[in-house]
């Protein structure tokens, strides 16, 4: 009987000093899929940035892009995002910045309102695919 094919799973470690001690990986590759754990508006030092939703969205998507690069992907490879906004009234401003990062084909997206636990206005998860 032939052996069932196995899927390679690769974990990408947390590098941000502000969250390095959390028990998580920033991304996991399973086959051709890359799952990016929730990213927020932290700068390179791990500090939540100041500013309105536009600044938080821009920093968060830069962080998503950086994590994707660890796995050899770009925002062009993203097929799905999940977004948590702390304030639903920020939806229009968020969308304007989001559209800058996804100018062509847009990934599927779910957007919810939720109280974020780390003091940021937004959190984004992403799923990418690269064969």
Please name every model-derived segment.
Residues 1-62, 66-76, 85-131:
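N-terminal presequence-like segments and the immediate start of the first folded domain
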């Amino acid at each position: 009987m032939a052996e069932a094919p196995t899927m390679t799973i690769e974990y990408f470690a947390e590098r941000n000093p502000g969250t390095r001690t959390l028990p998580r990986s920033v991304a996991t590759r399973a086959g051709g899929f890359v799952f990016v754990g929730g990213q927020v508006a932290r700068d390179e030092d791990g500090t939540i940035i100041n500013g309105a939703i536009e600044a938080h969205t821009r920093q968060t998507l830069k962080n998503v892009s950086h994590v994707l690069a660890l796995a050899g992907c770009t925002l062009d490879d993203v097929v799905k995002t999940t977004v948590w906004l702390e304030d639903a009234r920020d939806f229009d401003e968020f969308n304007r910045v989001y559209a800058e990062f996804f100018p062509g084909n847009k990934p599927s997206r779910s957007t919810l309102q939720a109280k974020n636990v780390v003091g940021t206005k937004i959190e984004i998860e992403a799923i990418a695919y690269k064969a």
